[in-house]
A protein has these predicted regions:
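Active-site mouth of glycoside hydrolases
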Residues: 1-186, 190-197
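Aromatic-enriched hydrophobic runs in primary sequence
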Residues: 1-2, 10-16, 29, 50-61, ...
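A sequence-composition feature that detects small, non-aromatic residues
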Residues: 3, 9, 15, 24, ...
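Aromatic-residue hotspot detector
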Residues: 16, 80, 353, 359-360
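Generic marker of "main functional regions" within proteins
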Residues: 50, 66-68, 142, 150-152, ...
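Extracellular glycoside hydrolase catalytic/binding regions
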Residues: 115, 120-123, 134-290
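Aromatic- and carboxylate-lined catalytic core of secreted/periplasmic carbohydrate-active enzymes
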Residues: 222-350, 356-373
Length: 373
């Protein structure tokens, strides 16, 4: 705890306004959970505007679960803790630390039947929507590190649905939670309509099967990792996860930010995923990729193919050797794409193709772009 309120900016700004009343644990005045911090939301709006100019999305995590699980130091300063706000939140005081530093407050925090917390949660979720409603490049997610219960995930989506009905607006909403909760929501014909993006972040396939913590067990992702073997992952496992959900729910985008995701950008791309971590050194190829869809290949195939007869095809080859594919009749340019640097090199300037085409692979893990002329 701070000795006093003698602090220098910049502060760790929160979404809620200070009241000028009382003294919170950090030595400053208490928060009002019903009033937005205008400076905080102004900065997020400014970030979204600057990002839009560069084609960058803002993923707005409404909550941060780390405040209520694991590190007690985050909870002591959290606006939702009773001593830090004027709203009478009824969490236990003094803080029930485990081993003098760990905190397990998720069960109480996610209690939507709590008459004090429920309206505060609803008002805050609506605040997140209201304050970013004019920004088309903002994606709303429930919480960073979220392993919370299904009932709170439903509550969050129901609140968004109510807001959408009242305002006529539809922000981009990503469903980012454990697999069991994700599958339950996607099976709900009404709540699934609210979801635009399926975000695979808190589960993954590994070489022996599936790593998927259960929702609502009052444990953070890192704590689950200590209890359950994470296992080894690779291109095939990332590809299969994305392709499975793109196939089941073709009207929704799928993002993948799970185990070791930066390594699997090409797997995500070839499976039809969005926001893959790939370098592409050609604006034309980037544009054409947005028009392509699945053609052939599975996670363990020698090659995966995506394409569109109108613009061409992209082939990801895992090894050396010939790759034969069916293509629309026409003239094409064949390029090789370095999957690490993104450098695009032309292999053949003009090829007239009728029906099938064979690429002679010269290296492992190489992408080929068959550009329609």
């Amino acid at each position: 705890r701070r000795a006093d309120g003698d602090v220098w900016a910049p502060f760790y700004e929160q979404a809620f306004s200070r009241t000028g009343q009382g003294t919170a644990w950090d030595g400053l005045s208490c928060y009002d959970l019903t009033k937005p911090n205008q400076w905080y939301w102004m900065r997020l709006n400014e970030f979204a505007e600057k990002g839009a100019e560069k084609g960058i999305l803002l993923f707005n995590q409404n909550y941060f679960q780390h405040n209520i699980l694991e590190a007690g130091a985050h909870w002591v300063d959290c606006p939702w803790r009773p001593v830090n706000n004027v709203n009478g939140t009824n969490f236990p005081e003094p803080v029930p630390f485990t081993g003098d530093k760990r905190i397990f407050m998720a069960e109480q925090f996610y209690d939507i039947n709590n008459p004090i917390l429920r309206p505060l949660h609803k008002q805050y979720i609506r605040q997140c929507l209201d304050n970013l409603k004019d920004k088309g490049n903002v994606v709303q997610l429930l919480s960073e590190e979220y392993t919370g219960p299904l009932h709170f995930t439903r509550f969050w989506l129901e609140t968004i649905a109510e807001w959408e009905k009242e305002t006529g607006l539809h922000p981009m909403v990503a469903l980012s939670c454990t697999k069991d909760a994700q599958d339950a929501i996607l099976a709900d014909p009404e709540l699934s309509k609210v979801v635009d993006i399926i975000d695979i972040r808190y589960w993954h396939y590994n070489t022996k099967g599936l790593w998927a913590p259960e929702a609502g067990k009052n444990l953070a992702p890192r704590q689950f990792m200590r209890k359950m073997k994470v296992g080894k992952t690779g291109f095939a496992e990332a590809y299969n996860a994305v392709k499975e959900y793109r196939t089941k729910y073709p009207e929704k985008a799928v993002t993948f930010f799970s185990q070791q995701y930066p390594q699997y950008g090409w797997a995500i791309l070839m499976a039809g995923g969005s926001c893959p971590n790939v370098a592409i050194g050609s604006d034309k190829l980037l544009t054409d990729l947005t028009k392509m869809s699945y053609i052939s290949g599975e996670g363990n195939s020698a090659a995966q193919v995506i394409g569109n007869p109108a613009v061409g095809y992209v082939i990801y080859a895992h090894g050396e050797g010939d790759i034969t594919l069916n293509v629309e009749n026409g003239k094409y340019t064949l390029h090789a794409v370095d999957t690490k640097s993104g450098v695009v090199k032309t292999v053949k300037k003009s090829e007239k193709i009728s029906g099938t085409y064979t690429i002679s692979g010269k290296a492992k893990d190489t992408a080929y772009w068959l550009e329609r002329l």
